[in-house]
Amino acid sequence: MLIERTACAGVLLTLDGKRILMDGVCREVKPYPATPPAIRTRLESSLPDALLLTHKHEDHYDEAFVSQYVQNAAGPVLGPADIPYTNQRDLTLGNIRILSLESRHIGKAQPLEHRSFVLRGSKCVWFLGDASPLLWKNRSDLPKPDVMLVPYAYAIGSGWDICRSLGASSVVLLHLPQQSDDPYGLWEAVTQTVAQHPGPALYIPKMGERILIPE
């Protein structure tokens, strides 16, 4: 399994011979970075086998890229109902079963369309977008994750407790700003929490960095 960070909170996942882009092209929403032009150009010239989109916020979603992908009929697009071209159904991609789950954005009192995804292949991968960690507390109806791809809230305070309880061997933390431009103190909060409460292997990839996890 190969995971490449391509966006603020998104990755290109290569699993069982399939390339799946998950929230993988985004715009800048300060202090969170945009997809670098070189990475975007590469993705446009070699389109993935499927797109998974969690929600419509610009730090997770780029309408022009999705439209281009659909026009080239490159593959299925899963996402919430308020994003054009998407469907909300589970599907099978090669050896991978993809579950599309209705979920709730962190801290959003007002309704917001949001999906999370569980991918079951040779490894089980959870990609949660900006879903609240509380949604997964004491859940027994979903397959145990091998790898979780999650935003910073899952490594701070009670979010880390829930993350550890789910039993993943590896956690890839996304949606962090540059350490030099962190007005909310997220890096410090993550560092303190993880130091005080050791858990699964934690990866915090830089933009464009690739993580190889043996299958």
Predicted regions mapped to residue ranges:
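Zn-dependent metallo-beta-lactamase
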Residues: 1-21, 26-29, 35-37, 181, ...
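Active-site-proximal beta-strand elements of phosphoester/diester hydrolases
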Residues: 2-5, 20-23, 97-103, 124-130, ...
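Active-site beta-strand termini and strand-to-loop segments that position acidic
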Residues: 13-17, 93, 119-122
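Pre-active-site segment of Zn-dependent metallo-hydrolases
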Residues: 16-52, 64-68, 132-143
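Active-site neighborhood of phospho(di)ester-bond hydrolases with catalytic His/Asp-centered motifs
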Residues: 21-25, 47-63, 78-81, 126-131, ...
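Active-site HxH/HxHxD metal-binding segment of metal-dependent hydrolases
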Residues: 38-94
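Binuclear metal-ion centers of metallo-dependent hydrolases, dominated by the metallo-beta-lactamase
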Residues: 84-96, 110-111, 162-215
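Active-site-proximal loop/helix segments of hydrolase catalytic cores
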Residues: 105-166
